[in-house]
Curated annotation (Swiss-Prot):
InterPro entries: FliE
GO molecular function, one term: structural molecule activity
Protein name stated in the entry: Flagellar hook-basal body complex protein FliE
Pfam families in the record: FliE
Stored HAMAP family: FliE (MF_00724)
One term under GO cellular component: bacterial-type flagellum basal body
Domain of life assignment: Bacteria
GO biological process terms held by the UniProt record: bacterial-type flagellum-dependent cell motility
Amino acid sequence: MSAIQGIEGVISQLQATAMSARAQDSLPQPTISFAGQLHAALDRISDTQTAARTQAEKFTLGEPGVALNDVMTDMQKASVSMQMGIQVRNKLVAAYQEVMSMQV
């Protein structure tokens, strides 16, 4: 009898999981556009570069509380994010060219 009760317990857990999954599926999913995500990523790259440039200007002007290592770290972050953006662009262009060269 305990084996049957164990199986019934597992079945009830599976049913509860299935019902919660159905409830989550019925909720409206936010639409995420590719263009919106790309624009947001470009904005983050731009913000990173602007912050690094501002930090470097503050250090150059001798403002207190701005350390050289912070400036160098911000400049490297900006450089890496720009290189990442360039590589993403290159991959997108390559994918576009591949799609355009496909036979219809």
